[in-house]
């Protein structure tokens, strides 16, 4: 938010951040808001300052034995869980990526989906980055299934809780309260939440403690010292995507793997349970650490606000209990080299295979057993469909109607199963109307838009 990263990159200036320094401060602020809501601290304080003694009006609630639902079990979410256990709260947790191994050890009950949290929680606190998956994660439909006694807390990013839906719920007394430390636009032009006694608003104070600022400064200084001494460049926002002087073909495969990871992060929704990669052909005889890391970067990036790189990705993956099962086979004859990745989630299992042709041309050559060939660049629409005539023409017609140019198209079939798929590389990102229209075609079973660059 404070540095023009693209300009710094153009000038050759390395930019680094310190994501861990404010973890405790953000978690403590979350607990402060939970406590303040539960005991009506803010309205009671304002009332007494106004000369009114209203002890009965501001009777509160205990945290003891209440259910706290935490959405996002990263560093801050886990810190909140540990603190809340000190108040004897029952913790339910859900993470869109994967629950960290330590979560259950500290007493967090891992939920399979968000509905469990929405229906059973007395308090719901969000600790996820803002992205396409989490924007408006909590809206009117989600609030409808919550307890009337629920209280919502957002110390993460504005927009994760839909503000219109939250306002309507507070106005109708559909929920017991809310606490907001973040807003879609800061400072917020909209002051409507200030009218509710049961809604606490603070000006993005999550990381605003003296101790957090010292921690951030110390971490920044240590990162700088390490970099100057030639050590690993930690938390770099604009570092090169590969490390060391790898062979050119390895660099190409690292980029291919990143794009395959990005594709799988879209077509394999759900919490990650298992990750496997396979190297075949001559690439299996080369140093491929950067390729596996490139794959993880693509797979995990949308779940983190900080840019992932070759230094921080393995650490962040380990924190979430994600590891790669890697196999190599140099003795193959069907293709010179290939990289294949398989991701198992709680909802689906997907496999994508790619190869580098001519040393520079990145290609996807197989998706879930469908043999195809498509260039993994820009936006790629992946469609799983019934195998019937007219599919290609119908897809092309819809794209043409929305002035979308098809760059490459891969088509795969499984005649015995009467199933097929298309992978369509586009010259621009399709708008929602085009995707909706494609999804309504009678032969389409699943459709995904993968952003690979």
List PLM regions with ranges.
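Rossmann-fold NAD(P) dinucleotide-binding segment
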Residues: 1-7, 132-152, 163-167
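Phosphate-binding beta-alpha-beta segment of Rossmann-like dinucleotide-binding domains, i.e.
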Residues: 11, 18-67, 79-86, 235
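Short beta->alpha connector loops at strand-helix junctions that form conserved
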Residues: 12-24, 95, 114, 156, ...
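Glycine-rich adenosine-cofactor-binding loop
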Residues: 19, 64-85, 253-260, 383-392
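Rossmann-like dinucleotide/phosphate-binding beta-alpha-beta segment
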Residues: 56-148
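An N-terminal-biased, well-structured beta-alpha scaffold segment characteristic
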Residues: 1-15, 119, 139, 275
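A conserved regulatory-domain signal marking ACT and ACT-like small-molecule sensing domains
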Residues: 241-243, 247-453
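Rossmann-like dinucleotide-binding domain for NAD(H)/NADP(H)
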Residues: 15-16, 101, 149-268, 304-305, ...
């Amino acid at each position: 938010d404070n540095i023009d990263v693209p300009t710094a990159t153009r000038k050759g200036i390395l930019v680094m951040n310190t994501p861990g320094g404010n973890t405790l401060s953000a978690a403590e602020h979350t607990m402060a808001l939970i406590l303040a809501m539960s005991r009506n601290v803010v309205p009671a304080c304002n009332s007494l300052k106004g000369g009114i003694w209203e002890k009965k009006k501001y009777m509160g609630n205990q945290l003891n034995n209440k259910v706290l639902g935490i959405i996002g079990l990263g560093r801050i979410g886990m810190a909140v869980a540990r603190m809340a256990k000190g108040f004897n709260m029952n913790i339910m947790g859900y993470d869109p990526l994967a629950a960290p191994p330590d979560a259950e050890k500290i007493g967090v009950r891992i939920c399979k989906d968000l509905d469990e949290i929405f229906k059973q929680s007395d308090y719901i606190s969000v600790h996820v980055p803002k992205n396409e998956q989490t924007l408006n994660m909590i809206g009117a439909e989600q609030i409808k299934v919550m307890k009337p006694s629920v209280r919502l807390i957002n110390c993460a990013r504005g927009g994760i809780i839909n503000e219109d839906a939250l306002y309507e719920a507070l106005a109708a007394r559909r929920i017991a309260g809310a606490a907001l430390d973040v807003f879609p636009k800061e400072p917020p032009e909209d002051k409507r939440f200030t009218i509710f006694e049961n809604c606490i608003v603070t000006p993005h104070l999550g990381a605003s403690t003296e101790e957090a600022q010292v921690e951030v400064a110390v971490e920044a200084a240590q990162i700088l010292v390490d970099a100057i001494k030639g050590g690993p460049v930690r938390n770099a926002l604009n570092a090169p995507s590969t490390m060391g002087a790898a062979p050119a073909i390895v660099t190409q495969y690292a980029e291919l793997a990143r794009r395959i990871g990005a594709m799988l992060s879209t077509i394999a929704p759900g919490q990650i349970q298992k990750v496997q990669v396979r190297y075949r052909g001559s690439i299996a005889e080369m140093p491929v650490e950067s390729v596996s890391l490139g794959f993880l970067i693509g797979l995990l990036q949308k779940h983190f606000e900080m840019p992932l790189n070759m230094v921080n990705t393995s650490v962040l993956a380990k924190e979430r209990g994600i590891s790669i099962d890697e196999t190599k086979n140099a003795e193959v004859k069907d293709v010179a080299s290939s990289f294949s990745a398989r991701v198992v989630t709680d909802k689906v299992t997907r496999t994508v295979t790619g190869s580098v042709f001519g040393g520079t041309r990145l290609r996807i050559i197989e998706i879930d057993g469908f043999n195809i060939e498509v260039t993994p660049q820009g936006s790629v629409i992946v469609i799983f469909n019934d195998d019937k005539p007219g599919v290609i023409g119908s897809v092309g017609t819809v794209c043409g109607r929305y002035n979308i140019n098809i760059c490459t198209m891969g088509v795969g079939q499984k005649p015995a199963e009467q199933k097929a798929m298309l992978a369509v590389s586009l010259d621009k990102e399709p708008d929602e109307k085009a995707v909706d229209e494609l999804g309504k075609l009678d032969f389409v079973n699943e459709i995904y838009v993968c952003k690979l660059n």
